[in-house]
């Protein structure tokens, strides 16, 4: 039975500006069973806070889809803060590294599947699916990996092992049930998905938990006591009357179903081998027979094999070609989907199926997989549409799909800080570089920063060199720069190490810098992906965090995309100015803390940064050890909170300290 728990939003802020009307409109739309709604939220208007308020008012389990792991991690941290008493879960691909199996016919090269699974993310995925069967106050932040195949939710739910104090059950029966749901006995290396036995006591480490295991104590053939225990220290956390243990794998199957599945795989193998031999593809037939029989033997003996997901259509006893089960099937009948940055996320969802199919087809043609492997796939876009009943798209620049399916946009244009969309100035390209240099110099004199966006890598490099020769402190941001370096460059821009950053695509997350008062768009009239109306609006938004924000477009003609972006920005500005005038608000630049690589032991302003870099050299051995321990604690906490950027920064600091020790 799913427990009903209301959503409790914790925040020191109340909805402001046009947040209250946006929240009310979306809540009304959900209650009226509207299928599609779009929240058009300008940069910096607090879209996440609006989404949180909608979830609280509507009270439905909610899936929030982001277009990459970094964004999903940021959203997860924010929603955890907003809903500390509710189940906020994280569901992304559990691969730190993933090389899918592939075959290159031209060189006769088979690339074996190679993957590194992140155990913590696997635990979070199990936590997400089990939460959906236990409570209804669930928010799952997911990447596009939520449309990839998962086991049958009914089977997953029906195979739970339920233990209750006073229940008649022999110890051996519990052990058998645990093995049936993919738990393995390990009395020495006790970890997630295992159990250990000590006399009449069975300790089980659920796949969905991080540090807590369940201790079940027997008296004869009866369960005498159930306790939650810290698996490392043995400290008793609390007594339980009842506990539900969910399977250790999402691809779990009953023994009788496994027998039927194996028969189905054997039948398909027989048909496919005949087909290949008739076409005189003897090498492919031999390869397929050998690989499949090995997998079947593993399934008979272990109930599992490497790459078992490729047989998912048989394991779930579905017809060939049918829609796979995904995370979406684990939700009940009444739930909500929110798609963040929908103008990027929806095309990503749409494109997943074709890319996956092309790779698998080559494997099937050359005898590495059975044709049914095609059914272990992401959803087609039409299937995604069928499975989702109510959607809210969230974007500053909604795409064609959202515009086509939404009758009326819910606008959120007013920022709580009173900040306006920037002024836009279009200038001719003649003498643009000299004009640009004088504008940058003007900002440098006022201790402000500049972003310059170009169209090509070569132009970015040449411009950076030219600006350096002109005495401007500048750096070049491009796709080859690693995440950590990227964070450092942005931090250095904020701290004044650089006056300007030159780049090609400055739309990516993490470029919201309050110190930036000028955004320069070169070749604004060259139509294309980087100069489309949506890209221009997103780029213009980078100057909307500063009360002196301005955008200069260098162009010899005004394109349709430019005109749309200029008109839309002006429309928003007028609404924002009117609101500020009515409420007596003075726009104020956001004061955003600068997160530093060395923020663990000393506050990260410039003075402290200098102190910190000198600190390791002055420390005694004891002080250094203490500092290392503090940083290690903070690093583990950051990783646990999914603040991976901070964790990486702290890790590098540790290396530095240890090297100097």
Curated annotation (Swiss-Prot):
Motif annotated as Beta-hairpin, chain positions: 94-117
Intracellular or extracellular location(s): Cytoplasm
Keywords from the named record: ATP-binding, Cytoplasm, DNA damage, DNA excision, DNA repair, Excision nuclease, Nucleotide-binding, SOS response
Gene3D superfamilies found in the cross-reference section: P-loop containing nucleotide triphosphate hydrolases, UVR domain
Pfam family, one: UVR
Chain ranges of the Helicase ATP-binding domain: 28-414
Gene Ontology BP terms: nucleotide-excision repair; SOS response
Keyword Isomerase assigned: no
GO MF annotation list: ATP binding; ATP hydrolysis activity; DNA binding; excinuclease ABC activity
Function: The UvrABC repair system catalyzes the recognition and processing of DNA lesions. A damage recognition complex composed of 2 UvrA and 2 UvrB subunits scans DNA for abnormalities. Upon binding of the UvrA(2)B(2) complex to a putative damaged site, the DNA wraps around one UvrB monomer. DNA wrap is dependent on ATP binding by UvrB and probably causes local melting of the DNA helix, facilitating insertion of UvrB beta-hairpin between the DNA strands. Then UvrB probes one DNA strand for the presence of a lesion.
Protein name according to UniProt: UvrABC system protein B
